[in-house]
Protein backbone atom coordinates (compact mmCIF):
# COMPACT_ATOMS: atom_id res chain seq x y z
CA UNK A 1 0.00 0.00 0.00
CA UNK A 2 1.45 3.33 -1.08
CA UNK A 3 1.44 6.35 1.25
CA UNK A 4 2.20 9.98 0.44
CA UNK A 5 3.21 11.63 3.71
CA UNK A 6 4.24 15.04 4.98
CA UNK A 7 8.03 15.02 5.32
CA UNK A 8 7.88 16.81 8.69
CA UNK A 9 6.15 13.90 10.41
CA UNK A 10 8.50 11.81 12.60
CA UNK A 11 8.82 8.05 12.90
CA UNK A 12 7.27 7.20 9.53
CA UNK A 13 9.62 4.34 8.67
CA UNK A 14 8.87 2.40 11.85
CA UNK A 15 5.16 3.26 11.81
CA UNK A 16 4.65 2.10 8.22
CA UNK A 17 6.91 -0.87 7.44
CA UNK A 18 6.17 -3.22 4.52
CA UNK A 19 3.63 -3.81 3.03
CA UNK A 20 3.55 0.01 3.12
CA UNK A 21 5.73 2.18 0.90
CA UNK A 22 6.14 5.80 2.00
CA UNK A 23 6.83 8.72 -0.34
CA UNK A 24 7.42 12.16 1.18
CA UNK A 25 6.19 15.57 0.11
CA UNK A 26 7.82 18.77 1.34
CA UNK A 27 5.47 21.37 -0.13
CA UNK A 28 1.77 21.30 -0.90
CA UNK A 29 2.33 22.08 -4.58
CA UNK A 30 4.20 18.76 -4.93
CA UNK A 31 1.14 16.75 -3.94
CA UNK A 32 -0.88 16.63 -7.20
CA UNK A 33 1.96 14.99 -9.10
CA UNK A 34 3.13 12.72 -6.27
CA UNK A 35 -0.37 11.53 -5.41
CA UNK A 36 -0.70 9.39 -8.55
CA UNK A 37 -0.96 5.68 -7.67
CA UNK A 38 -1.11 6.40 -3.93
CA UNK A 39 -3.61 4.80 -1.57
CA UNK A 40 -3.14 7.04 1.47
CA UNK A 41 -2.49 10.76 1.93
CA UNK A 42 -0.99 11.41 5.38
CA UNK A 43 -0.97 15.12 6.18
CA UNK A 44 -0.95 17.75 8.92
CA UNK A 45 -3.57 20.38 9.70
CA UNK A 46 -1.80 22.92 7.49
CA UNK A 47 -3.08 21.17 4.35
CA UNK A 48 -6.59 21.85 3.06
CA UNK A 49 -8.12 18.55 1.97
CA UNK A 50 -10.81 19.15 -0.66
CA UNK A 51 -11.87 18.41 -4.21
CA UNK A 52 -9.36 20.80 -5.72
CA UNK A 53 -6.50 18.84 -4.15
CA UNK A 54 -7.81 15.33 -4.72
CA UNK A 55 -9.50 15.59 -8.12
CA UNK A 56 -8.35 12.99 -10.66
CA UNK A 57 -6.87 10.81 -7.90
CA UNK A 58 -8.07 7.48 -6.55
CA UNK A 59 -6.83 7.47 -2.96
CA UNK A 60 -8.63 5.32 -0.39
CA UNK A 61 -7.66 7.06 2.86
CA UNK A 62 -6.92 10.56 4.09
CA UNK A 63 -5.07 10.45 7.40
CA UNK A 64 -4.38 13.60 9.40
CA UNK A 65 -1.72 13.49 12.10
CA UNK A 66 -3.58 15.98 14.26
CA UNK A 67 -6.55 16.25 16.60
CA UNK A 68 -8.38 18.90 14.58
CA UNK A 69 -10.17 18.04 11.36
CA UNK A 70 -11.58 21.41 10.27
CA UNK A 71 -9.10 21.42 7.36
CA UNK A 72 -10.92 18.46 5.78
CA UNK A 73 -13.91 18.70 3.45
CA UNK A 74 -15.89 15.80 4.90
CA UNK A 75 -18.80 15.91 2.40
CA UNK A 76 -16.41 15.67 -0.55
CA UNK A 77 -14.46 12.77 0.92
CA UNK A 78 -17.67 10.93 1.80
CA UNK A 79 -18.95 11.46 -1.75
CA UNK A 80 -15.78 9.81 -3.05
CA UNK A 81 -15.85 6.94 -0.51
CA UNK A 82 -12.54 8.09 0.93
CA UNK A 83 -12.06 7.01 4.55
CA UNK A 84 -10.83 9.57 7.09
CA UNK A 85 -8.37 8.77 9.86
CA UNK A 86 -7.52 11.30 12.56
CA UNK A 87 -5.28 11.38 15.63
CA UNK A 88 -7.66 12.85 18.19
CA UNK A 89 -6.10 13.23 21.62
CA UNK A 90 -2.53 12.95 20.39
CA UNK A 91 -1.54 16.39 21.64
CA UNK A 92 -3.72 16.82 24.74
CA UNK A 93 -0.76 16.75 27.14
CA UNK A 94 1.23 19.12 24.95
CA UNK A 95 -1.58 21.69 24.82
CA UNK A 96 -2.07 21.47 28.59
CA UNK A 97 1.67 22.14 28.96
CA UNK A 98 1.31 25.18 26.71
CA UNK A 99 -1.50 26.58 28.85
CA UNK A 100 0.61 26.10 31.97
CA UNK A 101 3.57 27.86 30.32
CA UNK A 102 1.31 30.81 29.51
CA UNK A 103 0.08 30.87 33.10
CA UNK A 104 3.66 30.76 34.37
CA UNK A 105 4.57 33.81 32.30
CA UNK A 106 1.40 35.69 33.23
CA UNK A 107 1.83 34.89 36.92
CA UNK A 108 5.41 36.16 36.92
CA UNK A 109 4.14 39.37 35.36
CA UNK A 110 1.47 39.57 38.11
CA UNK A 111 -1.33 39.57 35.54
CA UNK A 112 -3.49 36.80 37.03
CA UNK A 113 -6.15 38.41 39.21
CA UNK A 114 -7.77 35.35 40.75
CA UNK A 115 -8.18 31.58 40.63
CA UNK A 116 -11.62 31.23 39.05
CA UNK A 117 -11.15 29.62 35.64
CA UNK A 118 -13.53 28.62 32.88
CA UNK A 119 -12.75 25.85 30.40
CA UNK A 120 -14.64 25.95 27.11
CA UNK A 121 -14.66 22.49 25.55
CA UNK A 122 -14.11 19.35 27.63
CA UNK A 123 -12.75 16.98 25.03
CA UNK A 124 -9.42 15.29 25.57
CA UNK A 125 -7.48 18.57 25.61
CA UNK A 126 -9.92 20.45 27.82
CA UNK A 127 -10.02 17.51 30.21
CA UNK A 128 -6.23 17.56 30.58
CA UNK A 129 -6.33 21.30 31.28
CA UNK A 130 -9.08 20.67 33.83
CA UNK A 131 -6.93 18.07 35.60
CA UNK A 132 -4.01 20.51 35.88
CA UNK A 133 -6.06 23.47 37.10
CA UNK A 134 -8.12 21.34 39.47
CA UNK A 135 -4.96 19.90 41.04
CA UNK A 136 -3.72 23.46 41.50
CA UNK A 137 -6.97 24.31 43.35
CA UNK A 138 -8.54 26.65 40.82
CA UNK A 139 -12.29 27.16 41.12
CA UNK A 140 -13.53 25.80 37.80
CA UNK A 141 -16.49 26.42 35.48
CA UNK A 142 -16.76 23.79 32.76
CA UNK A 143 -18.64 24.79 29.60
CA UNK A 144 -19.53 22.11 27.07
CA UNK A 145 -23.30 21.83 26.37
CA UNK A 146 -22.86 19.27 23.55
CA UNK A 147 -20.95 17.00 25.94
CA UNK A 148 -23.73 17.38 28.53
CA UNK A 149 -26.28 16.12 25.99
CA UNK A 150 -24.13 13.05 25.24
CA UNK A 151 -22.94 12.31 28.77
CA UNK A 152 -25.53 12.51 31.55
CA UNK A 153 -22.77 12.41 34.19
CA UNK A 154 -21.40 15.75 32.94
CA UNK A 155 -23.09 19.02 33.81
CA UNK A 156 -22.14 22.10 31.81
CA UNK A 157 -22.02 25.52 33.37
CA UNK A 158 -23.86 28.39 31.69
CA UNK A 159 -22.37 31.14 29.55
CA UNK A 160 -23.21 33.54 32.36
CA UNK A 161 -21.01 31.54 34.74
CA UNK A 162 -18.05 32.17 32.44
CA UNK A 163 -18.48 35.93 32.77
CA UNK A 164 -17.34 35.73 36.41
CA UNK A 165 -14.06 33.98 35.59
CA UNK A 166 -10.58 35.46 35.91
CA UNK A 167 -9.27 33.06 33.27
CA UNK A 168 -10.88 31.42 30.23
CA UNK A 169 -9.19 28.52 28.43
CA UNK A 170 -10.63 27.79 24.98
CA UNK A 171 -10.38 24.16 23.82
CA UNK A 172 -13.59 23.55 21.87
CA UNK A 173 -13.71 22.12 18.36
CA UNK A 174 -14.60 24.67 15.70
CA UNK A 175 -18.07 23.99 14.30
CA UNK A 176 -21.29 25.77 13.34
CA UNK A 177 -23.74 23.06 14.41
CA UNK A 178 -26.89 24.25 16.16
CA UNK A 179 -27.88 24.66 18.93
CA UNK A 180 -24.40 25.24 20.37
CA UNK A 181 -22.07 26.43 17.60
CA UNK A 182 -18.54 27.28 18.67
CA UNK A 183 -17.95 29.51 15.63
CA UNK A 184 -17.84 33.10 16.94
CA UNK A 185 -18.87 31.88 20.39
CA UNK A 186 -16.69 34.56 21.98
CA UNK A 187 -18.26 37.51 20.20
CA UNK A 188 -18.96 41.15 21.04
CA UNK A 189 -21.83 40.35 23.40
CA UNK A 190 -19.75 37.73 25.20
CA UNK A 191 -16.63 39.88 25.49
CA UNK A 192 -18.39 42.92 26.92
CA UNK A 193 -19.67 40.82 29.84
CA UNK A 194 -16.21 39.70 30.97
CA UNK A 195 -14.50 41.09 34.04
CA UNK A 196 -11.81 43.72 33.34
CA UNK A 197 -8.46 41.96 33.41
CA UNK A 198 -9.93 38.60 32.42
CA UNK A 199 -7.40 36.43 30.59
CA UNK A 200 -8.40 34.43 27.52
CA UNK A 201 -6.04 31.65 26.41
CA UNK A 202 -7.10 30.34 23.00
CA UNK A 203 -5.36 27.10 22.05
CA UNK A 204 -8.19 25.74 19.92
CA UNK A 205 -9.11 27.49 16.67
CA UNK A 206 -9.13 31.15 15.70
CA UNK A 207 -12.75 31.24 14.56
CA UNK A 208 -14.09 30.60 18.06
CA UNK A 209 -12.97 34.07 19.15
CA UNK A 210 -14.34 36.85 16.94
CA UNK A 211 -11.17 38.77 16.23
CA UNK A 212 -12.90 41.94 15.02
CA UNK A 213 -14.99 42.09 18.18
CA UNK A 214 -11.87 41.60 20.27
CA UNK A 215 -10.06 44.41 18.46
CA UNK A 216 -12.91 46.85 19.08
CA UNK A 217 -13.42 45.90 22.71
CA UNK A 218 -13.09 48.86 25.03
CA UNK A 219 -12.41 47.00 28.28
CA UNK A 220 -9.07 45.57 29.31
CA UNK A 221 -9.07 41.88 28.35
CA UNK A 222 -5.75 40.04 28.14
CA UNK A 223 -5.73 37.85 25.03
CA UNK A 224 -3.21 35.03 24.69
CA UNK A 225 -3.54 33.03 21.51
CA UNK A 226 -1.90 30.25 19.56
CA UNK A 227 -4.50 30.28 16.78
CA UNK A 228 -5.87 32.81 14.31
CA UNK A 229 -8.26 33.39 11.45
CA UNK A 230 -6.78 32.77 7.99
CA UNK A 231 -3.52 31.16 9.06
CA UNK A 232 -0.79 31.83 8.03
CA UNK A 233 -2.09 35.21 6.83
CA UNK A 234 -2.81 36.36 10.36
CA UNK A 235 -4.02 39.81 11.34
CA UNK A 236 -1.20 42.07 12.51
CA UNK A 237 -3.66 43.91 14.75
CA UNK A 238 -4.32 40.74 16.73
CA UNK A 239 -0.59 40.17 17.10
CA UNK A 240 -0.18 43.73 18.36
CA UNK A 241 -3.07 43.42 20.81
CA UNK A 242 -2.19 40.00 22.21
CA UNK A 243 -0.30 39.66 25.47
CA UNK A 244 1.05 36.35 24.19
CA UNK A 245 0.85 35.18 20.56
CA UNK A 246 2.46 32.01 19.25
CA UNK A 247 2.45 30.31 15.82
CA UNK A 248 -0.07 27.46 16.34
CA UNK A 249 2.38 25.24 18.19
CA UNK A 250 0.55 24.47 21.44
CA UNK A 251 0.22 20.81 20.49
CA UNK A 252 3.65 20.46 18.95
CA UNK A 253 5.72 18.67 21.57
CA UNK A 254 7.94 15.90 20.26
CA UNK A 255 5.87 13.32 22.12
CA UNK A 256 2.66 14.65 20.55
CA UNK A 257 4.12 14.46 17.05
CA UNK A 258 5.27 10.87 17.49
CA UNK A 259 1.95 9.96 19.14
CA UNK A 260 -0.01 11.38 16.20
CA UNK A 261 1.83 9.18 13.72
CA UNK A 262 1.44 6.15 15.99
CA UNK A 263 -2.33 6.70 16.41
CA UNK A 264 -2.84 7.00 12.66
CA UNK A 265 -0.68 3.93 12.06
CA UNK A 266 -2.61 1.82 14.57
CA UNK A 267 -5.94 2.83 13.04
CA UNK A 268 -4.77 2.06 9.51
CA UNK A 269 -3.22 -1.28 10.50
CA UNK A 270 -6.43 -2.20 12.32
CA UNK A 271 -8.61 -1.28 9.35
CA UNK A 272 -6.46 -3.44 7.10
CA UNK A 273 -6.24 -6.35 9.54
CA UNK A 274 -2.47 -6.00 9.99
CA UNK A 275 -0.47 -6.43 13.22
CA UNK A 276 0.84 -3.27 14.85
CA UNK A 277 4.49 -2.37 14.25
CA UNK A 278 7.01 -1.18 16.83
CA UNK A 279 6.79 2.60 17.05
CA UNK A 280 9.64 5.06 17.33
CA UNK A 281 9.70 7.45 20.30
CA UNK A 282 11.71 10.63 20.90
CA UNK A 283 14.80 10.53 23.06
CA UNK A 284 14.21 11.50 26.68
CA UNK A 285 15.42 14.99 27.64
CA UNK A 286 17.73 15.92 30.51
CA UNK A 287 16.38 16.08 34.06
CA UNK A 288 15.63 19.52 35.43
CA UNK A 289 16.96 21.05 38.61
CA UNK A 290 13.94 20.90 40.88
CA UNK A 291 15.11 23.61 43.29
CA UNK A 292 12.82 26.12 41.59
CA UNK A 293 9.14 27.00 41.71
CA UNK A 294 6.71 25.71 39.11
CA UNK A 295 6.88 28.91 37.07
CA UNK A 296 10.65 28.78 36.64
CA UNK A 297 10.52 25.10 35.76
CA UNK A 298 7.77 25.56 33.17
CA UNK A 299 9.44 28.55 31.54
CA UNK A 300 12.81 26.79 31.43
CA UNK A 301 11.16 24.17 29.22
CA UNK A 302 9.06 26.52 27.12
CA UNK A 303 8.59 30.28 27.42
CA UNK A 304 5.89 31.63 25.07
CA UNK A 305 7.25 35.17 25.22
CA UNK A 306 10.11 34.27 22.88
CA UNK A 307 7.90 33.37 19.91
CA UNK A 308 5.56 36.21 20.87
CA UNK A 309 8.34 38.75 20.45
CA UNK A 310 9.42 37.14 17.18
CA UNK A 311 5.91 37.57 15.77
CA UNK A 312 5.45 41.08 17.13
CA UNK A 313 8.72 42.23 15.55
CA UNK A 314 8.34 40.34 12.26
CA UNK A 315 8.54 42.25 9.01
CA UNK A 316 6.69 39.59 7.02
CA UNK A 317 4.16 38.16 9.47
CA UNK A 318 2.99 35.21 7.35
CA UNK A 319 6.55 34.11 6.66
CA UNK A 320 7.52 34.47 10.31
CA UNK A 321 4.48 32.46 11.39
CA UNK A 322 5.37 29.57 9.07
CA UNK A 323 9.08 29.65 9.91
CA UNK A 324 8.52 29.71 13.66
CA UNK A 325 5.99 26.91 13.42
CA UNK A 326 8.31 24.76 11.34
CA UNK A 327 11.23 25.36 13.70
CA UNK A 328 9.27 24.53 16.85
CA UNK A 329 10.56 20.98 17.17
CA UNK A 330 12.61 20.77 20.38
CA UNK A 331 9.93 20.88 23.11
CA UNK A 332 9.18 17.77 25.14
CA UNK A 333 6.15 17.11 27.32
CA UNK A 334 6.79 18.55 30.76
CA UNK A 335 6.49 15.20 32.54
CA UNK A 336 9.46 13.78 30.62
CA UNK A 337 11.77 16.12 32.55
CA UNK A 338 10.85 14.60 35.94
CA UNK A 339 10.51 11.21 37.57
CA UNK A 340 7.07 10.12 38.76
CA UNK A 341 7.71 11.08 42.40
CA UNK A 342 9.01 14.53 41.57
CA UNK A 343 6.10 15.49 39.34
CA UNK A 344 3.72 15.10 42.30
CA UNK A 345 5.25 18.25 43.79
CA UNK A 346 4.21 20.28 40.75
CA UNK A 347 0.53 19.54 39.95
CA UNK A 348 0.36 22.17 37.22
CA UNK A 349 3.25 20.54 35.35
CA UNK A 350 1.54 17.22 34.89
From Swiss-Prot:
* EC number(s) reported in the record: 1.1.1.290
Q: What would be an example GO MF term here?
A: hydroxypyruvate reductase [NAD(P)H] activity
User: Where in the cell is the protein located?
Assistant: Cytoplasm
* InterPro entries given in the database record: D-isomer_2-hydroxyacid_DH, D-isomer_2_OHA_DH_cat_dom, D-isomer_DH_CS, D-isomer_DH_CS1, D-isomer_DH_NAD-bd, Erythronate-4-P_DHase, NAD(P)-bd_dom_sf
Major localization class: cytoplasm
Metabolic or biological pathway, per its Swiss-Prot or TrEMBL entry: Cofactor biosynthesis; pyridoxine 5'-phosphate biosynthesis; pyridoxine 5'-phosphate from D-erythrose 4-phosphate: step 2/5
| One Pfam family from the record | 2-Hacid_dh
Q: Where does substrate bind?
A: 45, 66
Write down the chemical reaction(s) this protein catalyses.
4-phospho-D-erythronate + NAD(+) = (R)-3-hydroxy-2-oxo-4-phosphooxybutanoate + NADH + H(+)
Q: Which UniProt keywords apply?
A: Cytoplasm, NAD, Oxidoreductase, Pyridoxine biosynthesis
Keyword Cytoplasm in annotation: yes
Residues in the active site? 205, 231, 248
A GO cellular component annotated for this chain's UniProt record is:
cytosol
Kindly indicate whether the keyword Cytoplasm belongs to this entry: yes
HAMAP family assigned: PdxB
Function, please? Catalyzes the oxidation of erythronate-4-phosphate to 3-hydroxy-2-oxo-4-phosphonooxybutanoate.
Q: What is this protein called?
A: Erythronate-4-phosphate dehydrogenase
Q: Which gene encodes it?
A: pdxB
Amino acid sequence: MNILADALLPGLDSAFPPPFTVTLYHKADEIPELLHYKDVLLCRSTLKINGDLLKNHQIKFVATATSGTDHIDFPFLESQNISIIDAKGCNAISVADYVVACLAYLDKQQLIQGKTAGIIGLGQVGTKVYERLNAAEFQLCLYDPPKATRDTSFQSCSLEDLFECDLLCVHAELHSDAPYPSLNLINRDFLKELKPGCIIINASRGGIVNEEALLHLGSAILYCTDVYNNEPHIDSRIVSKATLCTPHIAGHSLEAKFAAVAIVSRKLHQMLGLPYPQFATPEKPYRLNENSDWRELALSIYNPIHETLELKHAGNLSSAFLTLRKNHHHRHDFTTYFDSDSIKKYPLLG
